[in-house]
Amino acid sequence: MKDGFLKAAALSPALRVADCTYNTAQIIQQLREAAGRGVKLAVFPEFCLTGYTCGDLFLQRTLQQGALTGLQAILDASRELDVVTLVGLPLLARGKLYNCAAVLCRGQLLGLVPKTYLPNYGEFYEKRQFTPGSTEVETITVCGQQVPFGTLLLFRCREMPSFVLGVEICEDLWSALPPSTFHALAGATVIVNLSASDETVGKAEYRRALVENQSARLLCGYLYASAGHGESTQDMVFAGHDLIAENGTLLAEAAPFAGGRAETELDCQRLEAERARNTSFEPSADGYVTVEFSLTPADAVLTRWVDPTPFVPGDPKRRAERCELILKMQADGLAKRLEHAHAKTAVIGISGGLDSCLALLVAVRAMKQLGRPTTDVLAVTMPCFGTTKRTRSNAEILCDELHVSFTEIDIANTVHSHFADIGQDESVLDVTFENGQARVRTLELMDTANRTGGLVVGTGDLSELALGWATYNGDHMSMYGVNAGVPKTLVRHLVRYEADIAATAELKNVLLDILDTPVSPELLPAKDGEIAQKTEDLVGPYELHDFYLYYVLRFGFGPAKIFRLAKAAFAGRAEYPDEVLYKWLRNFYWRFFAQQFKRSCLPDGPKVGSVTLSPRGDWRMPSDAAAALWLAELEQIPLKG
């Protein structure tokens, strides 16, 4: 439960129809095993104490009493288990029979939630035996305990207030307006569904989509435990299809006929963060009763997959689709700005590196979209002290293959003159030596744009903006920054995608060589013709910084939790021991706070994903905010050795 992680399981034990004693033993055995694995929330199927396929036997008092006897046995067994447990049973109350979910923890029966929607079509005829649940919550006596009974019940963990449980039963999810919708608006972050959904052709896909979509709509975790082996096969077959989803993502699944156990960790903090930032999610808890319970805090071992590249889809087909969409968004943003400004040219400083390559590719797409010749793109290369033959050659080949206008301005003499003006000793390779070149390049681009009636296209990416890896009023400044919403890890894939669809072998080869070139600003003199200044040696690996950036901005997680996630995401990577992850996380926070002043005056640029740093849009932060709290939390992280 540390960091908001809740280990949860959806379980479908084998059972015998109407044999409550046998079924109870199976449930208790699986519950104990789950507790041994650290599970804190265990959900069993609808009518798991009796079996769903009892038919008119549900009307027999013997079966009803057998279910209550089984419930008492589970309550007794649960006293020594630190697990919130949900089981399904028929319950006679108010003189009517209800299809109920019993919620229990440590021997206490927390509540009984009746099913709202009773299917009475096709193979289902629940209205023959059962009555729909009422929204009115009242207290009844069950197993010698006074228990709240009704559909408007929520269950909150005292030790982890972000874990609030809501309950629905099978058909409730399949209805037009599921009870879980109201549960979520009332504060439930985790919805459980006790189900007995029979298997038919195509139903598993539909069921999976329902669970994923409902978890996305409600910004919640969703556990679905369905009846499996042992149910009567007189007219139906039950496959034990168990699912756990979180905000639209399927985290765990027991496929039909695969054994009936789905288990993973839900991130309740993440769900809270999603709801906090979504102002359309309006809380409404009218009529609800919340029951509190206690669990012993535990540090769950993470088994859920943590994506080391959260900005980049893992599936090749989906990644290609995402790349094409982003390129179209960038191009459309630039096309609109060129049109609005009546710009005759799009002026881009070309270095032979990744970012300027992507900006050039986007500018070419924009001109084609506007029906204008690609020669209206003016690429300017500005070699100086650190420029290598490799990057210079790649810049020229790229421009030639894309059929854009190309010019070279050697800025060495201008920089020499500038250094003489300000008294800079050229043997001192300090920040003035580096930034002076960047600012001269920006001067050349701005004036070239004025001369040609054009617009300067910025090349800096989201990762550089987060780290402040840009010269203030140098490459930091442009008239429209097309890459401002694109993180470095994604820049690589966008360029690779363009290489994959390249019209000529020459274009593909130069793009691949650019991808293979170390990331560098080339502001220090080259050594033996090779790049002497490699960005990732100085500020750290971009795949780490993009990972940190995602969780800092997207969910507002603290350093300790992000460090924990990074350890899980990069486990097995020898180049990333804990000390390295910690070093660059600390570096990220220090730079992120210290460099906000650059982000406070960014040029316009298109948002392409959920994370962006525009001071006019998604990220508003004072330039003089202190990082002390975040750095202090980092100091508390224990490191081995």
Segments from the language model and where they lie:
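Enzyme catalytic cores with a strong preference for nitrogen-chemistry domains
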Residues: 1-347, 365-374, 401, 406
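ATP/NTP-dependent adenylation/nucleotidyl-transfer catalytic domains that generate, transfer
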Residues: 7, 161-163, 220, 232, ...
